Amino acid sequence: PGMCVLSFAFNGEKDNKYLPEHIEKNSVCYTGTHDNDTLVSLLKNMSAWDKNNFVAGVKNSLKEMNAGGNADTDEALCDAVIALGFACKAQLFVLPMQDAARLGGEYRMNEPSTDKAQNWSVRIEEKYFAERTAEDLRSLAEAYGR
């Protein structure tokens, strides 16, 4: 199956194969992988040009997929990317806890080709599990049949 990473989808290219509306059923969709930065950190560190493309792409995908949500704030943008992952046709959607809880780059799982002490040692404190409740994720799962 194809591996579709939404963090790479919204770069301004309308034919980008990672756009949620282009994802095929026989694939796995992720907001990001263990080697990507978190959504929050990705948005924080983007150039203005990249951020404009990202926001425009998310807004377009929300419209194309008839998914609720908006991209008016960084928090809403993260929520919209997550909703698009749930809404896409991929057989499987993987949502890293770092993105579900809207955590920053200090919670990145791994930075390839580095020997940082943080690599593979990330632990998420219990308090972050309350930030985005199971009910929020259950609602998305039910809405999109996951």
Predicted segments, located by residue:
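Catalytic cores of glycan-processing enzymes that make or break glycosidic bonds
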Residues: 1-146
